[in-house]
């Protein structure tokens, strides 16, 4: 960026300088470069904001629903910026969240953890974000009473099938699989907040896929392994309903 030398005449009022526009970008910067810089600045702001939200939640300054909605929105915005039209240029400056924070001297350990895992902590640990429900509609709170909401069970079942079908159709990229797996986990949490065998494997896969770089894909071996773990989780989920 060009440096502007300011020279004042003795009779010149310094207040006039405050009316002069100070350019944010050097004239030599192209529109594409400007867009890349603006995108990186948005990513920077998301990291800082997310870290504050995580800390606020840990201090009980915001409730589960506020936290989940805010973090979910920030994570989606983060992914949109990384997958923008200029993603090739963005990736030159964003090798990883850790490298990005080191480059711009960002201290945000809570945000880094959340961005690496790719889902709100309430989804990861099956923390309920429902404060109330209509009578007869809130039957998914525990497996001990053996009562589950039929609608939520159907949604979770459908999401299991959707993910497995996607893998069989050779879906193997981060942007293809992560949203499907995240939605699957959320739908499972609506049915029950109790842990069950192989649930942790779903979370491991969500985190593992979220850490893939743009352009990286799962290998055939990894796809078979994911399918196998999904089938085990599906059986364990249904065993919980019996």
From Swiss-Prot:
Membrane topology qualifier: Peripheral membrane protein
Ranges where the record places region Interaction with VSP36 and VPS20: 148-242
Domain VPS28 C-terminal: start-end pairs: 148-242
Predominant place of localization: cytoplasm
Keywords on record: Cytoplasm, Endosome, Membrane, Protein transport, Transport
Pfam families named among the record's database cross-references: VPS28
Effect of residue 40 to D: Abolishes ESCRT-I complex assembly; class E phenotype (malformed late MVB)
Gene Ontology, cellular component aspect: cytosol; endosome; ESCRT I complex; late endosome membrane
Localisation per UniProt entry: Cytoplasm; Endosome; Late endosome membrane
UniProt-recorded Gene Ontology molecular function terms: protein-containing complex binding
An annotated GO BP: protein targeting to vacuole
Domain VPS28 N-terminal residues, every copy: 11-125
PROSITE patterns: VPS28_C, VPS28_N
Listed InterPro entries: ESCRT_assembly_dom, Vps28, VPS28_C, VPS28_C_sf, VPS28_N, VPS28_N_sf
Task performed by this protein: Component of the ESCRT-I complex, a regulator of vesicular trafficking process. Required for normal endocytic and biosynthetic traffic to the yeast vacuole.
Family to which the UniProt record says this protein belongs: Belongs to the VPS28 family.
Quaternary structure, from the entry: Component of the ESCRT-I complex (endosomal sorting complex required for transport I) which consists of STP22, VPS28, SRN2 and MVB12 in a 1:1:1:1 stoichiometry. Self-associates. Interacts with VPS27; the interaction mediates the association with the ESCRT-0 complex. Interacts with VPS20; the interaction mediates the association with the ESCRT-III complex.
Any further remark recorded for this protein: Present with 1420 molecules/cell in log phase SD medium.
Record-given protein name: Vacuolar protein sorting-associated protein 28
Organism of derivation: Saccharomyces cerevisiae (strain ATCC 204508 / S288c) (Baker's yeast)
């Amino acid at each position: 960026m060009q440096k502007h030398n300011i020279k004042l005449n003795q009779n010149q009022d310094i207040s006039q300088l405050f009316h002069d526009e100070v350019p944010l970008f050097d004239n030599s910067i192209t529109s594409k470069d400007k867009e890349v810089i603006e995108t990186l600045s948005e990513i920077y702001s998301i990291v800082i904001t997310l870290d504050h939200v995580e800390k606020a939640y840990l201090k009980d300054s915001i409730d589960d629903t506020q936290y989940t909605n805010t973090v979910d929105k920030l994570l989606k915005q983060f992914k949109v910026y990384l997958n923008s039209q200029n993603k090739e240029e963005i990736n030159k400056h964003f090798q990883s969240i850790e490298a990005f924070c080191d480059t711009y001297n960002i201290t945000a350990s809570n945000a880094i953890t959340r961005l690496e895992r790719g889902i709100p902590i309430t989804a990861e640990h099956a923390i309920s974000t429902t404060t109330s429900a209509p009578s007869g509609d809130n039957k998914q709170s525990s497996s001990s009473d053996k009562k589950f909401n039929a609608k939520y069970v159907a949604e979770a079942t459908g999401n299991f099938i959707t993910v497995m079908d996607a893998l069989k159709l050779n879906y193997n990229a981060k942007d293809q699989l992560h949203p499907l797996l995240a939605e699957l986990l959320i739908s499972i949490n609506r049915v029950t907040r109790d842990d069950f065998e192989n649930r942790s494997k779903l979370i491991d896969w969500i985190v593992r896929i979220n850490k893939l770089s743009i352009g990286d894909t799962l290998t055939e071996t990894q796809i078979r392994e994911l399918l196998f773990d999904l089938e085990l989780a599906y059986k364990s989920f249904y065993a919980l309903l019996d």
